[in-house]
Amino acid sequence: MAKLNTPKGKLVRKLGVNIFGNPKFDRLLSKKGYGPGQHGKSGKRFSTYSVQLQEKQKIKFTYGMLEKQFRNYFEKASQMKGETGLNLLVMLESRLDNVIYKLGFAPTRPAARQLVSHGHFLVNNKKVN
């Protein structure tokens, strides 16, 4: 499984939201409220496509997924009955690594994902990775 090697601070400044939940990034956003790079963010208006893309990227980075995995979840959610966005959110929140993070067994989502992939948790008395 591939992972992102982008510095987290740069990613947080680019998105403008602390998606990792670390207080360090809250301080970073309060000190530097502009985007990364030499000139920061420009004052131009964003198109609807760019806003949708940025929201999708926030979700992907929050849950630590790549594009193909996210697309598969979206397709499953769109085939289910009900609202697609709500179904997608329910599916993402019910992933084992997210549940372990929410229960407090791991300090971060990537740490929870590592614990799951190393087989430290049993589901119905079977190792799950």
Each PLM stretch: what is its role?
Residues 1-103, 126-129:
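Ferredoxin-like alpha/beta domains used as RNA- or RNAP-binding modules
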